[in-house]
Amino acid sequence: GSRNFSKWCAQNGIPLQNNQVDIGVRVELPSIVWEDFSKKIYEPKIWYRSKGYGDKTRMFCFNERGSVVTENTDGVLTVNGHSYRDQSRKTENSNFALLSTIRFTEPFKQPIDYARHVASLANLISGGSVLVQRLGDLENGRRTDAKRLANSTTQPTLNAVPGDLSLCMPKRQLDNIIETLHALDAVAPGTANYDTLLYGIECKYYSARPQTENFMISGCKNIYAIGDGAGFTRSLSQAAANGLYVADQICSEN
């Protein structure tokens, strides 16, 4: 939706704002590591600002005793995570997203294409799949292979290809992720364990948004921009509420 909306705006001469993207990994570790938090908080969320670059890295989308999964978006495979209500489908691991936010400056204006390119590199290196790597192997500058993964104390819930994330993820984002993992280790010891698994690539897009007044596009009477695709919300519930709000607004005016 966001790409179609951006294309429509370009065709109609409507300027857009927002030039950032989140790129990172899906972290998987034994559920006991974050159990103290997950038993009290439905979804722990933490933001961390790196000392090296001053970038924001965020932990979110926490799945207690869940599974890592793949997503296919227009032929590009990325990773995600979920957990099942059915107790029989629970796992021994928990997973969460750990993404670094990068805001681009002029003249670059294609952050979504940038993220898709990074993800496609992981697809290329893995032979059409996604990658998984132990944190310890990543920090020691070596690839995780099938033998090392089999010996890992954390066993993967997704059949990803063991590999080297440093071959596809930009250094800046990778540095931010490693630094954040060690900061999280101070909160939940064991987070930065050698056998903590990192799956890549995971991306979250920030849709470009137009200038609006009460969600009506500036210079375009009776044309409204709302929801995730227009860059105003970041979830299904927010987008639905945004639609209801604007609908009430239109009805009150008429």
Regions found by a protein language model. Give the residues of each.
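Residues forming the flavin
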Residues: 1-254
